[in-house]
A protein has these predicted regions:
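N-terminal export signals
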Residues: 5-30
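Accessory terminal helices/loops
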Residues: 34-59, 248, 252-337
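Conserved beta-strand hairpin/beta-sheet module of binuclear metal-dependent hydrolase folds
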Residues: 68-134, 216-229
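Short, hydrophobic/aromatic-rich segments at coil-to-beta transitions
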Residues: 76-81, 191, 200-202
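Hydrophobic/aromatic beta-strand patches that form the interior of the parallel beta-sheet core
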Residues: 80, 145-147, 171, 204, ...
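A general structural motif
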Residues: 102, 140-143, 167-168, 257-259, ...
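Metallo-beta-lactamase
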Residues: 104, 111-113, 200, 205-207, ...
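Active-site HxH/HxHxD metal-binding segment of metal-dependent hydrolases
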Residues: 112-196
Length: 337
């Protein structure tokens, strides 16, 4: 099956469905008699939701940690946000789970630095079962799309758990496979729209932290998910000009679309602006994962003033032009202004 059948259209072009939609429509019509009425994901926007006041954040002793391997928080009835336990991975990535009438999208699948005895697939299946019970659906009728924001192992290490799961498609581990999964032909500028079944996710490229990275905008909650390109932690800028270009694309998008929250994939900062050391497995006073468009703008403006290697706090994130193994300041296009 053409992977692009779950895309509605290229957002920069005329709204013409891609190949495979006709077959999908026939299948939907045949099963309409037994399916409940579709959920309306496009009225009364943005769909209201909330983040928890405190996420699971590790413990002084990982050996004595009693929290579940993954915390599941329902932002609203059709959106779950998962977070990996820091006792299993000090990266503790977040993983949005978006539900539509036909498909479910899982973004970022966690890491296995400290322990690998965690069943992400089982937890995702539990979430799908719960959503289907609430909405009168058959879990087998929903296709699961397993994707990630970028090519770092803390975002895809658990993808293999889904390899033999029925009715599932997952993103490959090369740049070409990532871009091809979304049917893109002009990365990173091109926007494509993923149709989950009445719920649209807008996707485009956001390189800079790494070459292969995407931004995801959920039209239902109006949350902009930025992965590691912009998050409450150490934003390692490996490629300065692509990063500035990506930040400009994010801001341009926010200028023309309503955005309730900007959300990254990690939290590595305390509420007081403390930079938690790399590899720490206990962060008792974490800052919230959600950010604002204004904080995105402030970080973009701040980055243009950086002229020396170091780590710079914008008030929201740490901009790192000297990573753990690579200094990249000489690539900052603003260095000699």
């Amino acid at each position: 099956m053409d992977r692009r059948t779950f895309l509605t259209y290229n957002a920069a072009a005329v709204a013409v469905p891609l190949s495979g939609m006709g077959l999908s429509a026939l299948t939907d019509a045949a099963s309409a008699a037994v399916r409940p009425a579709p959920i309306d994901f496009k009225s009364n926007l943005p769909a209201q939701g909330s983040f928890p006041k405190k996420w699971i954040c590790g413990s002084p002793s990982s050996m004595d940690n009693t929290d579940p391997p993954v915390q599941v928080h329902w932002y609203n009835p059709h959106t779950a946000i998962l977070r990996q336990n820091k006792a299993y991975s000090y990266e503790a990535p977040f993983a949005p789970l978006y539900f539509g009438n036909d498909r479910v999208l899982l973004l970022d699948e966690g890491f296995v630095q400290l322990r690998n005895d965690w069943d992400l697939r089982g937890i995702v299946d539990q979430c799908i079962d719960e959503w289907c019970r609430r909405n009168g659906r058959d879990p087998a009728s929903l296709e699961l799309l397993v994707a990630f924001s970028h090519l770092h192992a803390d975002h895809y290490a658990a993808v293999n758990q889904f390899a033999d799961r029925p009715n599932t498609r997952y993103m490959g581990l090369t740049h070409e496979e990532m871009v091809g999964f979304w049917g893109m032909t002009h990365f990173p500028e091109e926007r494509v729209t993923l149709d989950l079944g009445g719920r649209d996710i807008v996707i485009w490229g956001s390189p800079g932290h790494v070459v292969s990275e995407f931004a995801y905008y959920d039209s239902h909650t109006q949350i902009l998910y930025t992965g590691d390109m912009f998050y409450r932690g150490r934003c390692y800028i490996s490629f300065w000009q692509p990063w500035f270009d990506s930040m400009k694309r994010l801001i341009d998008f926010c200028d023309t679309h309503p955005v309730t929250h900007v959300m990254g994939c990690h939290v590595e900062i305390s509420v007081d602006g403390e930079d938690y050391p790399y590899g720490l497995t206990y962060q008792p006073d974490e800052a919230p994962v959600e950010m604002t468009v204004q904080q995105l703008r402030e970080a973009f403006a701040y980055a243009q003033k950086i002229t020396e290697p170091g780590i710079y706090f914008t008030g929201t994130v740490f901009l790192c032009n000297q990573t753990r193994s690579l200094t990249t300041i000489d690539k900052n296009p603003y260095r000699y202004d």
